[in-house]
């Protein structure tokens, strides 16, 4: 592992069944959300968890250990509040955000955008971006899904590795 410059944001590599990708955390903008994602990653919470929802040209969603899209908890208990920052927008592919069921309902689920999604701005906490492995995100985004946006063939996070 190469040394990272001091003061650079933490990163997490997600090794998936379709290859690895790495996300850079926006710790200054979303500290509680980043802390949640980093700690869950360190604990192995996301290991062997499915990407349960993939919508072409929209998002790749995962982080629910039940694989249903209805589960998952944060390190703070059940749910925690949004950290919406007006400077951060879903301007393109590779934006890492929290999935939620409405305001202040963040748990463990997250999504990565596959294209600009301005309709999500102000509704989902953006807490990072894909900094390496965008080709893996593109492959994930093109898998065949059923009529509920669930992949026909399982795609999952095999393990996560925090790079401090």
Swiss-Prot record:
Keyword Isomerase on entry: yes
Any one Pfam family match given in the protein's UniProt record, by short name: Pro_isomerase
Record-level Gene Ontology MF annotations: peptidyl-prolyl cis-trans isomerase activity
Tissue specificity comment: Ubiquitous.
Primary location group: cytoplasm
Up-regulation conditions: Down-regulated by pathogen.
Subcellular location: Cytoplasm
Catalytic activity annotation: [protein]-peptidylproline (omega=180) = [protein]-peptidylproline (omega=0)
Keywords: Chaperone, Cytoplasm, Isomerase, Rotamase
PPIase cyclophilin-type domain location: 12-162
Record has Chaperone as a keyword: yes
Family annotation (PANTHER family): PEPTIDYL-PROLYL CIS-TRANS ISOMERASE-RELATED (PTHR45625), PEPTIDYLPROLYL ISOMERASE DOMAIN AND WD REPEAT-CONTAINING PROTEIN 1 (PTHR45625:SF4)
Described function: PPIases accelerate the folding of proteins. It catalyzes the cis-trans isomerization of proline imidic peptide bonds in oligopeptides.
Name the UniProt record assigns to this protein: Peptidyl-prolyl cis-trans isomerase CYP18-2
Organism: Arabidopsis thaliana
Taxon lineage: Eukaryota, Viridiplantae, Streptophyta, Embryophyta, Tracheophyta
């Amino acid at each position: 592992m190469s040394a990272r410059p001091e003061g650079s944001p933490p990163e997490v590599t997600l090794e998936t069944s379709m290859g690895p990708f790495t996300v850079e955390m926006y710790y200054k903008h979303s500290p509680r959300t980043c802390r949640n994602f980093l700690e869950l990653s360190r604990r192995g919470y996301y290991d062997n968890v499915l990407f349960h929802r993939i919508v072409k040209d929209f998002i790749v969603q995962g982080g629910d250990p039940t694989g249903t899209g209805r589960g998952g908890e944060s390190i703070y208990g059940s749910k925690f509040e949004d950290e919406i920052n007006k400077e951060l927008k879903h301007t393109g592919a590779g934006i890492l955000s929290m999935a939620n069921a409405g305001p202040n309902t963040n748990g463990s689920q997250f999504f990565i955008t596959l294209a600009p999604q301005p309709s999500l701005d102000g509704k989902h906490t953006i807490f990072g971006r894909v900094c390496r492995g965008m080709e893996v995100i593109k492959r994930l985004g093109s898998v065949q899904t059923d009529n509920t946006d669930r992949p026909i063939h399982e795609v999952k996070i095999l393990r996560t590795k925090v790079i401090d």
